[in-house]
Amino acid sequence: MAELPIDLDEGLRQRLSRIVDIEGKIPRALEALGPVAGRDVLVLDGAEGIRAQQLRDLGARVAFANARGPAGEVVFDAPAASADVVISLWSSFRGAAPEEIAEARRVLRPGGRLLVVHDYGRDDVSHLRGALPEYGPWSKRGGPFLRDGFKVRVVHCFWTFESIEDGVAFLAAAFADAGRAVASALKRPRLSYNVAIYHRTFDGASAPEPSGSAP
């Protein structure tokens, strides 16, 4: 499972895990859009860690599945109709490929929910990473998610540092020149960080979908 939106060396990764969304807005949004409490939740590319524990703390029964087979083919390693909610955290559904949608439909029970987390951009963190499709095309009304029946909820989070000095040191170590450029503009020990949760229901939902916000 992609515990974090960015893959860093282990030491920096541990530091990043203590920085991203310390307020817990992302798991609360997953509960609001699922819900996940008291339900069978399948996390793609799963492993024990921060996100799995956050889901369990909300009352989810968490299971994991690989999103791809040994040859790289799209196949979720889970039985048909085995989950109430499927969650992808940054790693899968990079553009909502039809094969992934079909696999989500297969493993979800009627009325099941698919929640796909990606970065949204329009924030401080996006300046660290350059141009990415999740920062523009994916969230457009004509993009791969919204044109295929998804709604989007934008969650306004932060990367929060212990101090401005701590932020400057981390950003330089993790992101080199781009990090130093962002750090030079720090006025307080945090960066704005926006996350998109694309969500949809499959087959026979018994209640209306939660409202989302679209750009």
Predicted segments with their positions:
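Adenosine-cofactor binding site in Rossmann-like domains, unifying the SAM/SAH pocket
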Residues: 63-77
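Conserved class I S-adenosyl-L-methionine
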Residues: 36-48, 113-144
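Conserved Class I S-adenosyl-L-methionine
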Residues: 145-146, 151-215
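Conserved SAM-binding loop of SAM-dependent methyltransferases across substrates and taxa
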Residues: 48-60
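A short, conserved alpha-helix within the catalytic core of class I
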Residues: 93-104
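Conserved alpha-helix/loop element of class I SAM-dependent methyltransferases that forms part
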Residues: 17-39
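A short acidic, Gly/Pro-enriched loop at the edge of an enzyme's catalytic core
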Residues: 74-86
